[in-house]
């Protein structure tokens, strides 16, 4: 069975959720549903998957420190990698950067599980079933 590399896309400014989100504090870093941010909720979702590699988090340079702080607060990931986007250019370049990184650091055949940090998944059990398929 191929290894699964969770890739959490946490870039962007969250400008469509203004005034809640700001350029330096975008929606993926906000606590909108419960006591965890959308990024933290996504990390928890990925950490509950069986036999996955440590998460790869793609984030803009300006959010690197708060991202690290939020990940470390969870204490759910002993290991993780933050991959910095020098410039935000939307989803495709972020996924390409993650694929290139994974190709250099993981075994051939590793499957990338792309997880936008600002998505809300209500049925965790079904999510896990679909990923397992």
Region locations from a protein language model:
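Conserved N-terminal catalytic core of the sugar/cofactor nucleotidyltransferase
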Residues: 1-8, 15-26, 31-116, 122-128, ...
